[in-house]
Amino acid sequence: MKYFTSEEIRENFLYFFEKKGHKKLPSSSLIPNDPQLLFTVAGMVPFKPIFWGKVEPTYTRITTCQKCLRTNDIENVGRTPRHHTFFEMLGNFSFGDYFKKEAIKWAWEFLTEELGLPAEKLWASVYETDDEAFNIWKDDIKIPENKILRFGKEENWWGPAGQTGPCGPCSEIYFDTGYTENCPDQENCTPACDCGRFVEIWNIVFTEYYSDENGNLSPLPRKNIDTGAGFERICAVTQGKYDNFDSDLFKEIIEEIQRIFGVKFRVNKSKDVSIKVIADHSRAIAFLISEGIIPSNEGRGYVLRRLIRRAVRHGALLEAKGPFLSSILETVIKKMGKIYPELIEKEALIKDISFMEEEKFFETMEKGMERLNNIIQNLNNETTLPGKIAFELYDTYGFPLDLTKEILSEKGIEVDEKEFTELMNKQREMARSASGKVEYDTEKQIYKEIDKFLTPTEFIGYDKLSSTEEVQLIIKGNSIVPQAQEGDEIELFFPKTPFYAERGGQVSDKGVIYNETFEAEVIHVKPIRNEIISHLVKIKKGSIKNGERVFLKVDEKKRKATEKNHTATHLLHSALRKVIGEHIRQAGSYVAPERLRFDFTHYEPLTQDQIKQIEYLINEQIQKAIPVNIYLKSLEEAKSMDVIALFEEKYGEVVRIVEIDDFSRELCGGTHVSNTGEIGLFKILEESSISSGVRRIEAITGFESLNYATELESIMTNLSKMLDSSRDQIPDKIEGILKTIKNQEKEIKQLQFQLATKNIERLAETPQIIEGEKVVVAQLENLEKDVHANTADILLQKLGRGVVILFNKSNNEQVSLVVKVSKDTSKKFHAGNIARKIASYLGGGGGGGPTFAQAGGKYANKVKEVIEHINDFMEV
């Protein structure tokens, strides 16, 4: 066989199909425009709408090399020759053009004539009832019948990629590597055997059907071809390698890993696993970060975090003591940057984010591994780790569950995942409760019942803030009632409403619902099921019956303030992407009349200069008084536009686009100002971290900004008077005061230390003797923490050998203690154990090592008892 480099194979494939009339397209993003998928998992994913028949193809023949990512078999990566997280898929696609005959013929032609793979080493498989494909292989390609296998749905049926979508029977091509070492029946080995001898290198899917969520099949509008050829596998077999990691795709990456760790590949099997894991995950990490994904605790960010932490763990197995991925990522970028220039463009970002995540995990991993190893030793031959321990490793040490499972599986131990999930859900529920948000159980039975006869509520609030409607239904608690009285808290339903229901981060409208004999305050408005909107109200006056007509009136002042903040949120999102980078993605938002909150993916705090730039950019758009243009498009049209959207959200077939000139364009169903000038003024109050990889900006607009400025003005005026300074002198004046305070605190510490050490010589001269060791116990008062510890140090030095126990009572009746034990004496008495026992008696806690410990307690009145009975607290 002729040797081809990976670059040549990729280029030859695309050129071959270009010659066959295919349009060559660049790889689509790893982040699909598909709410069912976290990542692009196959070459056909970007073309799902075309396969479905929802979108007409611009080209009926397309060829691509698509970057893909899968993590469903992550535990196998490194342990097998062919499992990967990131991989490339070569593809040729036909949308209602050619079908089985041409697809099979061209696959064979490329493999045997272009790449020169020996025909005798190739086998084919077809779906068990696909006689047409079988006959093409037999009669047209001339493969011997015994080399054409019929398989069932598990092997030779592809799709859908997600819960629903296009699918169909497929035909696969296998390469015979001749590797029979693992085969139990070498003479009769075929691709049906899973020994690893035969490698699937090509899959032609005859996409003829659509599968719904129940697995029901219906014919697609046209018959299509979807070819997926594993690039890594083709490179390996073309280059005469059994293992993908031995191909030139991984050569430089593995060489760099060997250089960093001083290890050799293919010498030690367990080290080979770690080398392969790091090589594979480095590619995935580089591509994910280049797509703007940041490590976090959910979604795509969680996958990235898992990959980095799994790579770090395998680095630690190769004796890494700190971050090491940077130069490996550099090698990945150098190797693949020519094909995927986004890697070169985002190189600094890739290395920065990876380094920060590595550094963070290295800080906790050693303690986490120590904790896990201790737990394993104490399992006493049990084969299941309690879920609460796995949760502790996740919550305290940052160990993703699958990493804990992988480490334990190496020792034959499982995890109680049910208990882990219960604890995780409990933590999330506590977080939800702490948020104070009104929660609706959309699955409660009464909502399921009304869903059967109520139609979706029409929202008319884009154009109207009031309307007269007929009450369709009244719910009180969990029951439908015919009427309700003053003081009742009920839910009202109408065919139409001007009240905005909470969604997309925007809070619901407030207001009133009334008629001549009835008045209710609107507390909350929420869509419950299938766009049916519930109005939670408190009856202030009178009573209400089913079928009555009432007037619905939105609080206009609150609505207008909310609109200002919502439009400002769009401006903020775009400004962040312009100032910080396009990796910024919305991670959440809260838009209310009083303020706005915007959560976004980013790996470090914003600088003051960046915050100023963002504020300036937004206020510049406000001053321009730009019209806010709102229009409707089909979802597929919107996806092809330069529009910001959370495509993992579920949108309808028609979407609403909010456009602010060329500065911002987002999919949004919320309410907005008609002109940016209405916002008035935008001011950032705070920028903070809410979780790893996610930051939050809180801001205000309009009159709230004016009130804020007025309040600051008042504070500055008062400060100026208090300091007897002009405003521009205030910073210098405060700096001078702080400097004076710092100097005085230093003097106080020195005086405290002098007073504390005054009696040291006397204490050292009259120690107690316990079990042959000198012990000094004393109580001091109101010492600074470092003075307290230093005093104990000096006292032990004076003592020479023995134990020093110093209590320090503060003004708030709390007590702290320091225990110091000389090295020789630590064989008899343990400082940490002494501190723990005393602290427990004093109603507190603490501890430390054999020679030094600190603790505290709340029962200062018990210190005297401890001193009098110190023998009882001396622990080995």
Curated annotation (Swiss-Prot):
Its cofactor is Zn(2+). It catalyses: tRNA(Ala) + L-alanine + ATP = L-alanyl-tRNA(Ala) + AMP + diphosphate. Keywords: Aminoacyl-tRNA synthetase, ATP-binding, Cytoplasm, Ligase, Metal-binding, Nucleotide-binding, Protein biosynthesis, RNA-binding, tRNA-binding, Zinc. SMART domains: tRNA_SAD (SM00863). Transmembrane segments: none annotated. GO terms for cellular component: cytosol. The keyword Protein biosynthesis applies. GO terms for biological process: alanyl-tRNA aminoacylation. Zn(2+) binds at H566, H570, C668, H672. Binds 1 zinc ion per subunit. Coiled coil: none annotated. GO terms for molecular function: alanine-tRNA ligase activity; aminoacyl-tRNA deacylase activity; ATP binding; tRNA binding; zinc ion binding. CDD domains: AlaRS_core. It is an enzyme of class 6 (ligase). Its EC number is 6.1.1.7. It is found in: Cytoplasm. InterPro entries: aa-tRNA-synth_II/BPL/LPL, Ala-tRNA-lgiase_IIc, Ala-tRNA-ligase_IIc_anticod-bd, Ala-tRNA-synth_IIc_core, Ala-tRNA-synth_IIc_N, Ala-tRNA_ligase, Ala_tRNA_ligase_euk/bac, DHHA1_dom. The keyword Zinc applies. Consists of three domains; the N-terminal catalytic domain, the editing domain and the C-terminal C-Ala domain. The editing domain removes incorrectly charged amino acids, while the C-Ala domain, along with tRNA(Ala), serves as a bridge to cooperatively bring together the editing and aminoacylation centers thus stimulating deacylation of misacylated tRNAs. Belongs to the class-II aminoacyl-tRNA synthetase family. NCBIfam families: alaS (TIGR00344). Catalyzes the attachment of alanine to tRNA(Ala) in a two-step reaction: alanine is first activated by ATP to form Ala-AMP and then transferred to the acceptor end of tRNA(Ala). Also edits incorrectly charged Ser-tRNA(Ala) and Gly-tRNA(Ala) via its editing domain. This is Alanine--tRNA ligase. It comes from Petrotoga mobilis (strain DSM 10674 / SJ95). The gene is alaS.
